[in-house]
From Swiss-Prot:
Disruption phenotype: Knockout mice lacking Plppr4 are viable but show a severe alteration of synaptic transmission leading to juvenile epileptic seizures. Excitatory transmission in CA1 pyramidal neurons is significantly increased. It is associated with transiently reduced weight during development, a reduction in brain size and higher mortality 3 to 4 weeks after birth. Heterozygous knockout mice, show loss of somatosensory filter function and altered resilience during stress-related behaviors. It comes from Mus musculus. Glycans are attached at N215, N220, N269, N363, N433, N456, N515, N545, N570. This is Phospholipid phosphatase-related protein type 4. The chain crosses the membrane at residues 68-88, 120-140, 179-199, 248-268, 277-297, 309-329. InterPro entries: P_Acid_Pase_2/haloperoxi_sf (IPR036938), P_Acid_Pase_2/haloperoxidase (IPR000326), PA_PP_rel (IPR043216). Keywords: Cell membrane, Glycoprotein, Membrane, Phosphoprotein, Postsynaptic cell membrane, Synapse, Transmembrane, Transmembrane helix. Postsynaptic density membrane protein that indirectly regulates glutamatergic synaptic transmission through lysophosphatidic acid (LPA)-mediated signaling pathways. Binds lysophosphatidic acid (LPA) and mediates its internalization into cells. Could act as receptor or a transporter of this lipid at the post-synaptic membrane. Modulates lysophosphatidic acid (LPA) activity in neuron axonal outgrowth during development by attenuating phospholipid-induced axon collapse. One of its GO terms (cellular component) is glutamatergic synapse. The lineage of its organism: Eukaryota, Metazoa, Chordata, Craniata, Vertebrata. Belongs to the PA-phosphatase related phosphoesterase family. Brain-specific, it is exclusively expressed in neurons (at protein level). Residues 454-494, 634-654, 672-701, 742-766 are annotated as: Disordered. The modification Phosphoserine is found at S37, S347, S386, S439, S462, S474, S608. CDD domains: PAP2_wunen (cd03384).
Length: 766
């Protein structure tokens, strides 16, 4: 076989699967395509001696050694046997129908007999029309189709030519022989099935008694005594006509006409284009109507009963439908399936060159802060949608995984004073978020703190025992909390109508000022916007981030059990949701997860949240917590002016070594309210001393930006605010640690407890 070496195709003869398809594609670039079929090695060697002139240029050639053997030894014997069987059944009396009984003087069987020469459609005419009509139509249609497709460039749409046994069979000859051969075989099969049913049933035709001429006198009994006759009492001279009168069900004219009409109609539907809107329906309806008329003439001329004709239509149409769909593949070219398979096996280079399949690369670094924040917020949506674009069967495509895990973006947001942005919200299908309205009543806060103090005293020993437990195996977790000035709204399964850019991520291990050599972490108090209601956004646990530690699992079970018991009572008391969450944490204890490093700092989120009165209109600072900082961007930016007392700058003050823990207090909202009772515990005195140190500094307008890099974590509880880090600081909720600033003589000192002033020009970098 002459190989198309100009295209770099491999010269193997027996190739299967994707190798054969690539060989065809490569050889087509050089002007010819050499197709090989399974087991085609012998035919390829026989065709190796053919010169290039013997092969038509620009034609698709397929070598096969199974075409002629199958045709000679399988298809022709089957067709010949069906023709021979039909001959014996139709033209000889070798097989006779059974003798079925009839009633005496039955009027339905006494219709006049019409000679074959007087029939509207004789049997020979039926055979000629049923065989020759569709066969000629198919051959003419294939010739026109071949001429039209041959004029196209590179013969697009043509089936490959077959080179078998040194003979070249073009697509016209192959398709015509295949379609006409199946049609002839279908007609023979339909006639055979009809004859077998007729011989088996022996139902009489409407003219049976006319040609039979029964001799009722030969019976032992009269017709009045026994009206149903099963004996052969026919006295007619023409036995052939009498036997034909016993083969009425089903009608042979109806079956053959229905088969021919349905088969040729399917051919027209598959091969004709939609260029002419009326030509295809015209041809289809013409053949269908001809078949129906052919069957109805058998009823009008008393050759068959109506039920015989209707059943013949069903039998012939069913056989034609089966052969048209499964024997000839609905008359579609066999190359279509190969082209579809080739598209699925395209190489990676072809996919890169195809603009419709190019995967858009993600730019991980950005100099613009807003664009970077929006990219973080929309990462889950992009990662989820990118997976659907990579599902291509049987395609060897190397998928580059993203740099960060997908679908694990747990975030912390303190958005009480954050500006609103008109960016599309990102719905996370995993977390279920809720926004709960918090009360602003200072008297109520004082009453709750008194109750917590009494409950905390009784559980101090149990909490100390939990503090000494060994470290859990759960990785650090992230929390998501949202404090907003919007009205109370609750959303389940991500159905909350809030801007998506207000969800940021924080990891306490990256907070500046945390010294690993010290036992505690920094203290931060965040002031709320004046006159705003508080919305605290607490996510439930995610499905993929669940710790497998035995101790953390037991703590989680304790937390969930307590939450179920206290939901009803908390709602009945009409307490704020954030107060209920903190109360549960004080009652049930803390979810313990000690850091791996014994000297690792700990940041505890306590429940001593105080409320800011609605009449306080002092200026408030803006704290912005951002996640995922880039390498080329500063981690912490604190605009400040000068250092010193009253400068208004934020400072991270290291704790005293005598203190075991420090507190990361959120939303100290009631600094101007009436004094509350201080809880006296083992940690309260140290924190109160640190609070008095900072009481003389004033807080001015300023924006503090804290950018921290989150790490992948696992959530333990559904409504917890505690996170743990292995080496860095940990944000945890302690039930026995409640820090309340002392009462100051002046409102200004009370306001600035836990605060350091900030100024709009200084920036710290980690």
């Amino acid at each position: 076989m002459q190989r198309a070496g100009s295209s770099g195709a491999r010269g193997e003869c027996d190739i299967s699967g994707a190798g054969r398809l690539r060989l065809e594609q490569a050889a087509r670039l050089g002007g010819r395509t050499v197709h090989t079929s399974p087991g085609g090695g012998l035919g390829a060697r026989q065709a190796a001696g053919m010169s290039a002139k013997e092969r038509p240029k620009g034609k698709v050639i397929k070598d096969s050694v199974t075409l002629l053997p199958c045709f000679y030894f399988v298809e022709l014997p089957i067709l010949a046997s069906s023709v021979v069987s039909l001959y014996f059944l139709e033209l000889t009396d070798v097989f006779k129908p059974v003798h079925s009984g009839f009633s005496c003087y039955d009027r339905s069987l006494s219709m006049p007999y019409i000679e074959p020469t007087q029939e509207a459609i004789p049997f020979l005419m039926l055979l000629s029309l049923a065989f020759a009509g569709p066969a000629i139509t198919i051959m003419v249609g294939e010739g026109i189709l071949y001429c039209c497709l041959s004029k196209r460039r590179n013969g697009a749409g043509l089936e490959p030519n077959i080179n078998a046994g040194g003979c070249n069979f073009n697509s016209f000859l192959r398709r015509a022989v295949r379609f006409v051969g199946v049609h002839v075989f279908g007609l023979c099969s339909t006639a055979l099935i009809t004859d077998i049913i007729q011989l088996s049933t022996g139902y009489q035709a409407p003219y049976f008694l006319t040609v039979c001429k029964p001799n009722y006198t030969s019976l032992n009994v009269s017709c009045k005594e026994n009206s149903y006759i099963v004996e052969d009492i026919c006295s007619g001279s023409d036995l052939t006509v009498i036997n034909s009168g016993r083969k009425s069900f089903p009608s042979q004219h109806a079956t053959l006409a229905a088969f021919a009409a349905v088969y040729v109609s399917m051919y027209f539907n598959s091969t004709l284009t939609d260029s002419s809107k009326l030509l295809k329906p015209l041809l289809v309806f013409t053949f269908i109507i001809c078949g129906i008329i052919c069957g109805l003439t058998r009823i009008t001329q008393y050759k068959n009963h109506p039920v015989d004709v209707y059943c013949g239509f069903l039998i012939g149409g069913g056989i034609a439908l089966y052969l048209g769909l499964y024997a000839v593949g609905n008359f579609l070219p066999s190359e279509d399936s190969m082209l579809q398979h080739r598209d699925a096996l395209r190489s990676l280079t072809d996919l890169n060159q195809d603009p419709s399949r190019v995967l858009s690369a993600k730019n991980g670094s950005s100099g613009d802060g807003i664009a970077h924040t929006e990219g973080i917020l929309n990462r889950n949506h992009r990662d989820a949608s990118s997976l659907t674009n990579l599902k291509r069967a049987n395609a060897d495509v190397e998928i580059i995984t993203p740099r960060s895990p997908m679908g694990k973006e747990s975030m912390v947001t303190f958005s009480n004073t954050l500006p609103r942005a008109n960016t599309p919200s990102v719905e996370d299908p995993v977390r279920r978020n809720a926004s709960i309205h918090a009360s602003m009543d200072s008297a109520r806060s004082k009453q709750l703190l008194t109750q917590w103090k009494s409950k905390n005293e009784s559980r101090k020993m149990s909490l100390q025992v939990m503090d000494t437990e060994p470290e859990g195996q759960s990785p650090p977790r992230s929390i998501e909390m949202r404090s907003s000035s919007e009205p109370s709204r609750v959303g389940v399964n991500g159905d909350h109508h809030v801007p998506g850019n207000q969800y940021l991520k924080i990891q306490p291990g990256t907070v500046p000022g945390c010294n690993n050599s010290m036992p505690g972490g920094p203290r931060v108090s965040i002031q709320s916007r004046p006159g705003s209601s508080q919305l605290v956004h607490i996510p439930e646990e995610t499905q993929e981030n669940i710790s497998t530690s035995p101790k953390s699992s037991s703590a989680r079970a304790k937390w969930l059990k307590a939450a179920e018991k206290t939901v009803a009572c908390n709602r009945s008391n009409n307490q704020p949701r954030i107060m209920q969450v903190i109360a549960m944490s004080k009652q049930q204890g803390v979810l313990q997860s000690s850091p791996k490093n014994a000297e690792g700092s700990t940041v505890t989120c306590t429940g001593s949240i105080r409320y800011k009165t609605l009449t306080d209109h002092e200026p408030s600072g803006i704290v912005r917590v951002e996640a995922h900082p880039e390498n080329n961007r500063p981690i912490i930016q604190i605009p400040s002016s000068t250092e010193g007392e009253g400068s208004g700058s934020w400072k991270w003050k290291a704790p005293e070594k005598s203190s075991l823990r420090q507190t990361y207090e959120l939303n100290d909202l009631n600094r101007d309210s009436e004094s509350c009772e201080s809880l006296k515990d083992s940690f309260g005195s140290g924190d109160r001393k640190r609070s008095n140190i900072d009481s003389n500094e004033h807080h001015h307008h300023g924006i503090t930006t804290i950018r921290v890099t989150p790490v992948e974590g696992s959530e333990i509880g559904s409504e917890t605010l505690s996170v743990s880090s292995s080496r860095d600081s940990t944000l945890r909720r302690k039930g026995n640690i409640i820090l309340i600033p002392e009462r100051s003589n002046s409102p200004e000192n009370t306001r600035n407890i836990f605060y350091k002033g900030t100024s709009p020009t200084r920036a710290y970098k980690d």
